[in-house]
Amino acid sequence: MKKILVIGDLIADYYLWGKSERLSPEAPVPVLEVKKESKNLGGAANVANNLISLKAKVFLCGVVGDDLEGKHFISALKAREIDTSGILTDKTRCTTLKTRIIAQNQQIVRVDKEIKDPLNADLRKKLLDFFTEKIQEIDGVILSDYNKGVLDFELTQKMITLANQHHKLILCDPKGKDYSKYSHASLITPNRAELEHALHLKLDSHANLSKALQILKETYQIAMPLVTLSEQGIAFLEKGELVNCPTIAKEVYDVTGAGDTVIASLTLSLLESMSLKDACEFANAAAAVVVGKMGSALASLEEIALILNQTHPKILPLEKLLETLEHHQQKIVFTNGCFDLLHKGHASYLQKAKALGDILVVGLNSDNSIKRLKGNKRPIVSEKDRAFLLASLSCVDYVVVFEEDAPIKLIQALKPDILVKGADYLNKEVIGSEFAKETHLMEFEEGYSTSAIIEKIKRTHND
C-alpha cells in the first residue's frame, strides 16, 4: 500500500438536493423544495478521499476553522480512515464551505463561505514541521492548491525542495498566475483555462499546447508537464513531442472534483512505475467514472477496471487516429495481423517493430475479416478482446480494427514511415508498400504460432 502525503486547502462541500417548479413571489428567482442534504469532503480532502478509494494510505495536512463545520469535517475524514494528525485549527478563520443548490440534478447556484488570507507564521511553521517529519516515511506528495491561503509561495517551494532532496515524487494541482511557485515539481496538472491564464497564451492549437508545455518544462523546471483538456483528454510531452491521451467517452453529469480524481490517480499510477502515457490513460478512466456521477464522486479500482475493459484509449477508429497523429513529427511504424491467441511470438514481433520508430500502430483484422480468411471456426478470441490485449502491451501505441481482408485503405490514409511485415513476404508483393516510406520484413520467433497452439489444445483434449 502506497503512502501519500496530501497538503492543501480543505473544503467542506454541502449539497441541497430538490426540485424547483416555481418562482418566488418575492423576487424573480426559483424556489427549491429540498428533498435531501449531503456533505462531502472537498479540495485537498477530496484528493485524499480519492486516494483512499484507490487503496492508498493517506496523511492529510491543512487547516480548518474553530467551528462546527471543522469538527464535522475532521470526523468525516476519520470515518474514511484518513490520517488527520497534520490538520491544524485556525481560530481566525472559518472552515471553507461551498454550498451547492441542486434542482432536478442541475446545479443552479453555489454559495461560498471562506477566508482566503495567508496563514500566520506559526501555522506555516507547524505545517512545514509536519511535512518534514513525514517526508521519509511516505512514497509521494500531492500539493492541492485551491488558493485559499494554505500554500503560499514560500511554503510551497520549501516543500518541493524537501521532496526533491528525499527523492520523492511531488505533484501539484496549481492555481493562480505565478507558476514559479511550483518550480521543480515532478508534475503539475493545470486545466486548459488555468494554463492559459498563467501563461497568457491561448491553447487553441497543437503548436501552442506544445509551446506551453515546453515553457513549464524549461522555465519552471517541471519534470513532467501536462495539461488536462476536459473532453479532449490529457496532453503531455514525450521526448519533446506533444502527445494527446484521449478521454474515454462517457455521459457527463457533473465535473465537480474531476481534477482531484486525476491528480490522485496519476500519483498512484506513477508510483506503481507506470509510464506517463499509461498513467494518463488510467487517470482518464478514473475521471470518466466520476463525471458520470453527481457531486464530488469517487472512482474505485473495480469501476476503473470496468471502464478500461469496456474500451481502451489506445483503440481508435481510423478517423480519430488520423486526428490524433495529425501534428506528430515522430516516426510512425505500422504493422497488421489477426493476433488470435496472443502469444510470445506476437509480443516479440511487436517489440521489434516498435524499436524501428517512435509510434507503433497495429491494424487488427475484424472477426468478419478473419472468418473470410481462415474459416468460420476462427477467430478463437473476439476482436474486442484481441484489441484490448494488444492495447495493453507497452510497445503498442494504437490499435485500429479494419473490416477488409487487407488494410490497404488504412495504410493509404495513415502513410506510415515504416511498414512492417513478416519475413514470409520475401519475394511477395507487400500490400500498401507504395504508401509507406520504407518496408521492413521481420523474422518471427521460431516455435510460436496460433495454429500450433490450437493443434496442441486439440491433441491435449483428445488425449
UniProtKB/Swiss-Prot annotation:
Chain residue ranges for the region called Ribokinase: 1-315
InterPro entries found in the cross-reference section: Bifunc_HldE (IPR023030), Cyt_trans-like (IPR004821), PfkB_dom (IPR011611), RfaE_dom_I (IPR011913), RfaE_dom_II (IPR011914), Ribokinase-like (IPR029056), Rossmann-like_a/b/a_fold (IPR014729)
Coiled coil location: none
Region spans: Cytidylyltransferase: 334-463
Keyword Metal-binding: no
Molecular function (Gene Ontology), one example: phosphotransferase activity, alcohol group as acceptor
EC code: 2.7.1.167, 2.7.7.70
BP GO annotations: ADP-L-glycero-beta-D-manno-heptose biosynthetic process
Keywords assigned by UniProt, alphabetized: ATP-binding, Carbohydrate metabolism, Kinase, Multifunctional enzyme, Nucleotide-binding, Nucleotidyltransferase, Transferase
Pathway: Nucleotide-sugar biosynthesis; ADP-L-glycero-beta-D-manno-heptose biosynthesis; ADP-L-glycero-beta-D-manno-heptose from D-glycero-beta-D-manno-heptose 7-phosphate: step 1/4; Nucleotide-sugar biosynthesis; ADP-L-glycero-beta-D-manno-heptose biosynthesis; ADP-L-glycero-beta-D-manno-heptose from D-glycero-beta-D-manno-heptose 7-phosphate: step 3/4
Active site feature: D260
One term under GO cellular component: cytosol
Pfam families hit by this protein: CTP_transf_like (PF01467), PfkB (PF00294)
Reactions accelerated catalytically: D-glycero-beta-D-manno-heptose 7-phosphate + ATP = D-glycero-beta-D-manno-heptose 1,7-bisphosphate + ADP + H(+); D-glycero-beta-D-manno-heptose 1-phosphate + ATP + H(+) = ADP-D-glycero-beta-D-manno-heptose + diphosphate
UniProt: ATP binding residues: N191, R192, A193, E194
Domain of life from the UniProt record: Bacteria
Database matches in CDD domains: RfaE_like (cd01172)
UniProt entry tagged with the keyword Nucleotidyltransferase: yes
Assembly information from the UniProt record: Homodimer.
Family under the similarity heading: In the N-terminal section; belongs to the carbohydrate kinase PfkB family.
Function per UniProt: Catalyzes the ADP transfer from ATP to D-glycero-beta-D-manno-heptose 1-phosphate, yielding ADP-D-glycero-beta-D-manno-heptose.
Protein name: Bifunctional protein HldE
Organism the protein comes from: Helicobacter pylori (strain HPAG1)
